Amino acid sequence: ARLGEICHRYGVIVVADEIHCDFTWWGGQHTVLLNAAPCLRDRCILCISPSKTFNLAGLQVANNIIPNPELRERFVQAKERPAFDECNVLGIVACMAAYNEGEEWYQQLKSYLEGNIRLVEEFVAEKLPGVTMIPPEATYLLWLDFKGPGLPEEEVTHKLLYEAKLWLNRGSMFGPTAAGFQRLNAACPRSTLESALERMRQTFCK
């Protein structure tokens, strides 16, 4: 809310990417930016999509919520430039079907991903000495802290890629304060995740 007030004071247009808003864990709740900072109503573009929740990324469909009619018109005009494509019909129909009929899928998916997150947390605590996992409040992207083993980030990344055959995102990609972390995507079949964790253990616990 405080950041929203600052943006409002200085006339900043805020683009809020809330594509992961459906994934909060164990009773947590996502607060939409416009609820946290109502003062931004006229200067906010809120971006959501069914692509993460319903695995529809290939259909390239998203929703942009722009309460301010003038800002919305500017957005539409910019989108109509030759470099931008319109949503395809199949994507629009799939988006509507997902939001209107996808509650059962969504609840089952959340339960499954919570199980995956618990699996990673327990495995790291029990079988990867020196490595810790930051318990997530939201999303299925997990942060593993590899600073404990004392290896440079470049060496950890190299070992993961060439020995464990795993491609994680190194923390420094997201800024200097994240150096030493690796980001793991837990949104996959549990057997795939178990195999990845075991290869990680074999690589760092020789």
Task: Please tell me what each predicted stretch does.
Residues 1-206:
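PLP-dependent class I/II
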